[in-house]
């Protein structure tokens, strides 16, 4: 049974084991999954946006095949050479419509984070910032 589609991101990068375990677990429950995560580690960047530079985009079919658990639910894995907030904005503001039209996310999950996000440090966290950015977009899409 297919469930609601989920966008996953993080600040630890596309090769993060936590991100891949989370994707595999949610996919095994039948959720269509789209991952758009930073190409490289982006911890403690807060809500940084890339405004004046081009960002490289890449699909990772090798990672998708490694974490795929349900053949009936779509799973697409992408990286962006940008911040976690860049990833969320690009994904929700048209990127996924172009690259993965079969996945229209209803929810964005950011994590699993490699380290702790505690106390005032959450203000610097790329993981928390990506979730905050997603809340600005997803709440408008599904009203």
What residue spans do the PLM features occupy?
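DG-centered beta-turn motif at the end of beta-strands
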Residues: 10-12, 112
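Conserved acidic residues
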Residues: 106-107
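Conserved small/polar residues in nucleotide/adenosyl-binding loops
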Residues: 141-143
